[in-house]
Amino acid sequence: MLFRLYGLLLLVIALSGCAEPPYSNLDNEQLETMLGRGVPIYDIRRAEEWHQTGVIEGSRLQTFVDDSGRVLPDFLAHLSRTVDKDDPVILICRTGNRTSTLARHLTEHMGYTQVYNVRNGITRWIGDDRPVTRL
């Protein structure tokens, strides 16, 4: 099952440049607006990344892939239990690559309707001197 999911995600990556994404990309100003409205943000990086850079205050920390790039088996099930498919959800990673893959999968294959990807991830957030909380 995990192998099939990983294969599916690789296919999504390969095809992602072919069309407009089915999710919305956010810049930092748009992200601040969404956070101000109470939209949850999921930081899908690994624990060592959270400790290295810090996280946006209020982020829900849930690792998507291990250090070998394998999708963690419980990730999608946990997300399905915590986020309704019609509720907005923001995804952030280091540079926006992992989250764009995940956002596409959530919208195209799992029926999520309001998925937001933070373009350029936490790297741009920090580069723009935005605040982070250290773990």
Language-model segment annotations:
Residues 92-93:
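Short, surface-exposed ligand- or partner-binding patches at beta-edge/loop junctions that are enriched
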Residues 41-43:
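Structural scaffold elements adjacent to functional motifs in cytosolic proteins
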Residues 2-6, 18-37, 47-88, 97-135:
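Rhodanese-like catalytic fold shared by cysteine-dependent sulfurtransferases
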